[in-house]
Amino acid sequence: MNNARLYQVLKGPVFSEKSQLLGDSLGVQVFKVDNNATKREIKKAVELMFEGVEVTKVNTLNVKGKTKRFGRTVGRRNDYKKAYVTLKAGQDVQMADAGEEIADNAASTSETANNE
């Protein structure tokens, strides 16, 4: 399994009341993942993307898309797979910090460009 495949496994975090509660109390992170991803691929992808994090357990479930109406038109949302990733005790995935670092670096480079 190559790293290019692992970078395509995780699609993004799931932010909900349940995922926040699980993250705070049990150290479980919730991600949207590729529909064809296996539990082993999900574990390796999380450990690759978030360095220093050890995954102890992965639970997955397939979420069926809801049927939605817009007037007379009937549509359907896409199906997706969700993964509950349990981390080793005392560890946490810091997703918000990475975004702040990128924003800080962009701000500092724009300030130096203005000074020159």
UniProtKB/Swiss-Prot annotation:
Superkingdom of the source species: Bacteria
Q: Which GO terms describe its molecular function?
A: rRNA binding; structural constituent of ribosome
Q: Which Gene3D superfamilies match?
A: 3.30.70.330
Key word Ribosomal protein present in the record? yes
Which GO cellular component does the record give, naming just one?
A: ribonucleoprotein complex
* Protein's name according to its UniProt entry: Large ribosomal subunit protein uL23
For the biological process aspect of GO, one term held by this record is: translation
Presence of keyword RNA-binding: yes
Pfam families to which the protein is assigned, alphabetical: Ribosomal_L23 (PF00276)
